[in-house]
Amino acid sequence: MAWTLLHSKLHQNLQRRFPELQGTRILVAVSGGQDSLCLLHLLNDLTKQWQWHLAVAHCDHRWPTDAGIADHVQGLAQGYKLPYFQRDAQDLPQTEAAARHWRYHALTAIAKAENFPVVMTGHTQSDRAETLLFNLVRGSGSDGLQAMNWVRNLEESGSDKSPIRLIRPLLEISRQETGDFCQQQQLSVWEDVLNEKLTYRRNRIRGELIPYLKKHFNPQVEKSLAQTVELLTAEVAYLEQVSGEIYQTLSQTDQKSLNCRLLSQKPLALQRRIIRQFLQSCQSQSPNFEEIEQIVGLINAPNRSQTSSLPGQGIVRVEGDFLRYIYQGK
């Protein structure tokens, strides 16, 4: 094995963030593209040091452009002498979001069935920057701007077990670096033709906006945006913890009332988060910015003031010192 800069980056990053992964069973999601193939090759090279038990998972959307990819990935797994698991979509996903949702569901199913506590994907620093821009231009709060955390829980694997974790270990490595690595290692990359179609918004960000920003504003824009995400993630986590603790002191036992007199003494940033948590406990739909602002406007409003109807068929009304959620459905 030729030790490279990417081997060092990944090894050191895992030591710093995920030292508990020593000896773990890891399911590696492989699409056949350069990022996931780079991840697979690096993990395979580091297996002796980390004592991992690796396996390859591939999710076949069964799109016409995907013909042959599953066989290619299975061949890669055989070349590495690793177990291979595949899931085929029963209904062809019609959108990027639907395909992404199905992939995570399929990966979770494989991990549960085959007893893998960790799933790894090849998302890179470039993906993180693109997701931040995508969320920013469509409108998003600081929570949405976190854009790809290092780790998240996929699904509870059972009451007596820990959750299956999705880990993205390449978030400090750019797509340029994974491409160069695959060329240097002479890895057989499957080029996804859909990545070139500019009808997809994410592809336009990747193929047009990012290159423009690199050329005219900052050659290191991907790294800068990814660092912004890292800062936002830490700040959002802190604000969520603080607002959650305050929410528990302001809400009544029925979870339908909030003390607006005490809420008025909190900073606006915390008021918005507390109100969002309040609405999430009262209705199934997540509130949007306008709905939260309606309720912010009630904090110091006269008694009996109320919002217009909310998506969950409810309203929020001022009743004395409290904001009360009232369901109006049948």
Curated annotation (Swiss-Prot):
EC code: 6.3.4.19
Residues that, per the record, bind ATP: 31-36
Identify the InterPro entries for this entry: Rossmann-like_a/b/a_fold, TilS/TtcA_N, tRNA_Ile_lys_synt, tRNA_Ile_lys_synt_N, tRNA_Ile_lys_synt_subst-bd
Tell me where it mainly resides: cytoplasm
Question: What are the record keywords, sorted?
Answer: ATP-binding, Cytoplasm, Ligase, Nucleotide-binding, tRNA processing
Q: In which domain of life is the source organism classified?
A: Bacteria
Drop me one GO molecular function for this one.
ATP binding
Example of a GO cellular component annotation carried by this entry: cytoplasm
Name the Gene Ontology biological process terms.
Answer: tRNA modification
Locations listed in the record: Cytoplasm
> Would I find ATP-binding among this entry's keywords?
yes
At the top of the EC hierarchy, this enzyme's class is: ligase
Pfam family of this protein, just one? TilS
Please give the catalytic activity noted in the UniProt record: cytidine(34) in tRNA(Ile2) + L-lysine + ATP = lysidine(34) in tRNA(Ile2) + AMP + diphosphate + H(+)
What function does this protein fulfil?
Ligates lysine onto the cytidine present at position 34 of the AUA codon-specific tRNA(Ile) that contains the anticodon CAU, in an ATP-dependent manner. Cytidine is converted to lysidine, thus changing the amino acid specificity of the tRNA from methionine to isoleucine.
Question: In the UniProt entry, what is the domain comment?
Answer: The N-terminal region contains the highly conserved SGGXDS motif, predicted to be a P-loop motif involved in ATP binding.
| PANTHER family for the chain | TRNA(ILE)-LYSIDINE SYNTHASE-RELATED
Q: Which family does it belong to?
A: Belongs to the tRNA(Ile)-lysidine synthase family.
Q: Any idea what this protein is called? A: tRNA(Ile)-lysidine synthase
Q: Which organism is it from?
A: Synechocystis sp. (strain ATCC 27184 / PCC 6803 / Kazusa)
Primary gene name: tilS
